[in-house]
Amino acid sequence: MLRGEIWQVDLDPARGSAANMRRPAVIVSNDRANAAAIRLDRGVVPVVPVTSNTEKVPIPGVVAGSERWPGRRFEGAGPAGWIRRCATSPLPS
């Protein structure tokens, strides 16, 4: 798990109009913190959910990424204001 990678994460439960469900998100924490969270098998990492509908993403503070997903290429963006925390244990390896 490295900074800038796109992972599929479960964002439920969400409040209000926040992004929810299982969706792609960009890892935004530094690599040392990610490695420690995985090694200790506990902790959370900050992520920014991304959407392929980039016209809805308000500027400034956009986090964008592109990653190879099975069968298709994903490109999307999400404003840094959408930052969420995800536990490392349920993230797929």
UniProtKB/Swiss-Prot annotation:
Keywords associated with the record: Endonuclease, Hydrolase, Nuclease, Toxin-antitoxin system
Pfam families: PemK_toxin
Top class in the EC scheme: hydrolase
Record-listed E.C. numbers: 3.1.-.-
Any single GO BP term: rRNA catabolic process
InterPro entries, sorted: PemK-like, Plasmid_toxin/cell-grow_inhib
GO molecular function terms attached to this record: DNA binding; RNA endonuclease activity
Subunit-level organization: Forms a complex with cognate antitoxin MazE1.
Function noted in UniProt: Toxic component of a type II toxin-antitoxin (TA) system, its cognate antitoxin is MazE1. Probably an endoribonuclease.
Family assignment from sequence similarity: Belongs to the PemK/MazF family.
Name of this chain's protein: Probable endoribonuclease MazF1
Source species: Mycobacterium tuberculosis (strain ATCC 25618 / H37Rv)
Gene: mazF1
